[in-house]
Amino acid sequence: MGDSGSRRSTLVSRLPIFRRSINRRHDSLPSSPSSSNTVGVHSSSPSSTNSSSGSTGKRRSIFRTPSISFHHKKGSEPKQEPTNQNLSISNGAQPGHSNMQKLSLEEHIKTRGRHSVGFSSSRNKKITRSLTEDFEREKEHSTNKNVFINCLSSGKSEGDDSGFTEDQTRRSVKQSTRKLLPKSFSSHYKFSKPVLQSQSISLVQQSEFSLEVTQYQEREPVLVRASPSCSVDVTERAGSSLQSPLLSADLTTAQTPSEFLALTEDSVSEMDAFSKSGSMASHCDNFGHNDSTSQMSLNSAAVTKTTTELTGTVPCAIMSPGKYRLEGQCSTESNSLPETSAANQKEVLLQIAELPATSVSHSESNLPADSEREENIGLQNGETMLGTNSPRKLGFYEQHKAIAEHVKGIHPISDSKIIPTSGDHHIFNKTSHGYEANPAKVLASSLSPFREGRFIERRLRSSSEGTAGSSRMILKPKDGNIEEVNSLRKQRAGSSSSKMNSLDVLNNLGSCELDEDDLMLDLEFLEEQSLHPSVCREDSYHSVVSCAAVVLTPMEPMIEMKKREEPEFPEPSKQNLSLKLTKDVDQEARCSHISRMPNSPSADWPLQGVEENGGIDSLPFRLMLQDCTAVKTLLLKMKRVLQESADMSPASSTTSLPVSPLTEEPVPFKDIMKDECSMLKLQLKEKDELISQLQEELGKVRHLQKAFASRVDKSTQTELLCYDGLNLKRLETVQGGREATYRNRIVSQNLSTRDRKAIHTPTEDRFRYSAADQTSPYKNKTCQLPSLCLSNFLKDKELAEVIKHSRGTYETLTSDVTQNLRATVGQSSLKPTAKTEGLSTFLEKPKDQVATARQHSTFTGRFGQPPRGPISLHMYSRKNVFLHHNLHSTELQTLGQQDG
């Protein structure tokens, strides 16, 4: 009964209300650790104040939807207080103190809720949906309120949680964790001290809190760290329950408070798990202290009261877990169980899910405590799981003992992961029995696995979410999927496969409802596991299957499973655990699954929601989508290919352009482009040929034009040339000597021009060359010279306009043509020179005349010919040429007159 009660409290803590309260605790948890340092006063102290009946509403507002647990308690908190009074005389006798502890617990929750800010919003939605319904159902039961009040009264555990959060924040420094645990203990202890004050008012509350406080106090010196750890573990269970959406937190054994704290408490529970696993002695002490505290509370108080106290103690860390633990214990031990059976059982299952982790350490340190609890009928559900007295604890306990031990042997890390995954019952039974059987071994196994899981989650947290991510990491192994982890533990225990999924659990357990719940948790857990690769990846594949199964399986089947699970577990604890686990799993699945996604506001949750619902859930769907997309693409490609093959014509391809416009347009375009390219190439070839022809023609024309240009530029040149020929003829006939002198002069000019032909401009050179060329033939054939000159002149005149039009082009080609013409002219001028031996004789004989001619040619070069420098073109102005020709013509005229 106590087992179910503590489990209920854990379940309550797992409820989205508590999760949101954990979020708020996380928000306030930074102050909560400081509050933990302030032994008596936590940030949760105000929360404790809110814990009063009126404070339940404050809790609701504080925790928002996570307050659903508080909502329920708000509505049923008056009942809860009476039930608390019934369950725990201290709580009932002194509801003020119960409220006070509740306030402290609530304050812890608030602080955790603050810390769990990220989770708060996500949990709000979660709580709003399935958990709200469950909490409303529980609200109907005053027992739940009383249990919750007891849970709140057990603010010590919650204080422990918040202290544990502080401790967990320090748990990076494990020694700091121990210190923080005492601080949180002292805060819890002071909360307990109010309980002790109320103990003076009520022995039951006293016994509960005095036992808790005494145990905490007693163990606080020795197990101060341990008892906070224990409280935190219980609280972590409760918080794990609270953070059921954070299945990972539930998966982490020691992370119930972190679940409750969502983010900060996640760190706390992670730290707690680490401190437990890091300092197994302290971990065992914590659990032992918690168990002993629970047992002491159980022993000191009535079983119900003790259960309430234990629930309160463990739930103190988590209001809802405490409440449900108390409620579960009370319901198990009193009539509130039926009322709270739905929520309490779910809470118990959540507690179990959370307690499995706690139970792992709890049972380790609580082997004697478990014996006490067994004697006490496992007053705390989580502890009852540790204590095998409860029927379900015994039933699953032995099964899960072997499973837990088996899991420990096979998957020590999986133990912490798998045990939560295998199922709440399995986890608790496994953890409780296996850990009870082998406290040190199981403790090491659970601690090291939880450590590893938490570390894995830490890594994920640090990588994806920072501290919040770490909390989420822890929450996921611990809180988020405690049920899922329980189912996974069941699966793994059954199949010894760490990858066993809720489907495997269904196959192994043969309980579709329970397994479907586990499937839901598996789905969530896998989603959360997406944040924890090592923890989640094992089940991610199966979670995909379970995701599909869950998607196919409505939420109702999970409720049906819960209902079926209730008969499956005839014993009240088992029924409560199964029912509430299923319920909580369903709510958890719906709340954490549905509200997780909607409640992404928290840094953790958005990632979780995305990763959970969008990551692992969507992983197979993404793969399927990719495959479908690839197939679609291939089909489209095939269709295009077929269409193209069928429609080879560009028109048909254009018609099929809508299907594949790019593929089909290129066909005609390519053809057109090819045609255009070929056309252009042909045009280029033609143009090149034309250009070459034109260049050749230009070369020819240029040769003529240069003489003609000279003549056109110098109107006297053509006449001069003809006149020169005629004059030379007359000179030769009349005065051979004078003519010879003139010819010699011309030849000398030609020679001098030939010597510097590279410098001469083509026009003048040509004129000189043509004059020279025609001078030498004139000696042999004088009559040909006028006709040649005339023909050349006519040719030049005919080409004059063409030359004028193409003068620009000729200018561009002038250099090349000039070189060619110079070469040809040089050859032609050499021929006349070779032929004119007479000229050479003249040159040889009248050297003085040659010198004179050269001087004249020099003069002529100065005036008529361009200078040799690069400024020849500048110097070769019409003025100079005209002057030169005038002088030359004047000289010839003088000679002619002399001849005449």
UniProtKB/Swiss-Prot annotation:
Bias (Polar residues) ranges: 81-100
Superkingdom per UniProt: Eukaryota
InterPro entries recorded: CCSER
Sequence ranges of Low complexity compositional bias: 29-56
Coiled coil: 673-707
Location of region: Disordered: 1-100, 156-178
Cell inner membrane is among the record's keywords: no
Upper classification of the organism: Eukaryota, Metazoa, Chordata, Craniata, Vertebrata
Family in the record: Belongs to the CCSER family.
Protein's name according to its UniProt entry: Serine-rich coiled-coil domain-containing protein 1
Keywords attached to this entry: Coiled coil
